[in-house]
Amino acid sequence: MKWALYALGLFVALIVLVFLIGSSLAGHHTATRAARFHQSPETIWGVITDYSKFPQWRKNVTHVESLPAVNGKPSWREFDKYNNALPYEIVEWTQPRRLSARIADPNLPFAGTWLYELTPQPDGSTSLRITENGEIHNVFFRFAARFFIAYTATMEDYLKALGQKFNEKTAIED
């Protein structure tokens, strides 16, 4: 019986510690990752804005639903293998150089935007830089994102998947 009480006490202490650490972390973060591709900005733009084809090259997206346009710009919902849905809307569209997409569900434990910047390089390649301006409202999720998931993991996966789409090896840059 004493052992069970000690175990319960340790578990509660761990939960409190995670809560305190998560509460002390900033709710907002900015993270950036980039990669170069041997493609034109127009080619990359065509792929990253054709959300209906995301499941063909992004392994974590199983299907996509079109949603009504918001302010004349595209909006869609992505589903993962667990059928979790994330709605997105475009907030900036400057073809083929700059795109900004926002998570469009205020009830999620996180929010934010991804800014995609495509820059042609002298050698004919294109640099794609993604900047995430994110907010994590839930302190437990904030703790997990900081210590276990990494703020840049999704961007890195996205850039690697894009490289695979083009049959290119992707070197991730800060």
Predicted features by range, described:
Residues 2-20, 24, 81-125, 133-136:
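Hydrophobic-ligand binding "helix-grip"
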Residues 37, 41, 47, 57, ...:
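Solvent-exposed, acidic/flexible segments
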Residues 48-58, 80, 159, 163-166, ...:
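Sec/Tat-exported extracytoplasmic proteins
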Residues 103-157, 162-164, 168, 173-174:
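Beta-strand/loop substructures that line and gate deep hydrophobic ligand-binding cavities in soluble
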Residues 2-69:
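Hydrophobic ligand-binding cavity/cleft-lining segments
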Residues 43-48, 54, 90, 99-101, ...:
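Hydrophobic pocket/interface hotspot
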Residues 52-87, 96-98:
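Short beta-edge strand/loop motif at the mouth of beta-sheet-based domains
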Residues 41, 48-51, 87, 115, ...:
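Extracytoplasmic/secreted envelope proteins and their assembly/folding machinery
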